[in-house]
Amino acid sequence: ASDVYKRQLMHRGISPKVLRYCVGSGILYQTTRGNYRNCVFVGKDENGVPRSAFQRGCQGSFRGDVAGSQKQYGFLIPAEIETCDTVEIYEAPIDAMSGATLRQYKHDAPWRSVHYLALGGLNHQPIDYFLQQHPEVKRVALCFDRDEPGRNFTKIVAKRLTERGYIVQDTPPAIGKDYNDYLLAARRLISMER
């Protein structure tokens, strides 16, 4: 029963390698209260101290911030190389994990060849904090949802970051509303080809 969240995320297409990394680095765990289990996605500060947490029900549609969360600390899967100059920014942790899984499956580069940042919604604070902490980052891929709020936020963020000198790429999911939809569709296509 303790691995319900891992099974649920694997059902959402997240690769075991990405899951192991997130659990092992303390940015993903499960809570249980009675019959309810939640995935908890953790945002840490520059010293690795947990500062924010976003919960999502393992079953059902429950989701929300943990009380006391500081929203500037997003869910981050850091690049393996500290001098990495690229970040992919997503709305939700599951989308960031989906982006990492897609990169792993494409084999075009090691899956941690970029930073993956999830905002926990459409919020500028984690972007500003991350870029302040990572002055080596020059390239930003905006991977927000393919819906009206996501597209509008992309325009606003792209303008702000371009004005600040960043190279900005608009990369909405090729299929579906978000990157998890895209991952699941890509996995179906791969399994049909086999």
PLM regions and their residue ranges:
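Electropositive nucleic-acid engagement tracts
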Residues: 6-34
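Short glycine-/small-residue-rich flexible loop motifs, especially phosphate/cofactor-binding loops
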Residues: 6, 96, 158
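Helix N-terminus capping/helix-initiation residues
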Residues: 15-16, 26, 68, 134, ...
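Short, small-residue-biased leader/transition segments that mark boundaries at the very start
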Residues: 1-5
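Residue-level preference for alpha-helix termini and adjacent loops
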Residues: 27, 74-76, 178-183
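TOPRIM fold recognition
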Residues: 85, 101-194
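Generic structural signal for bulky hydrophobic/aromatic residues embedded
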Residues: 8-12, 44, 102, 182
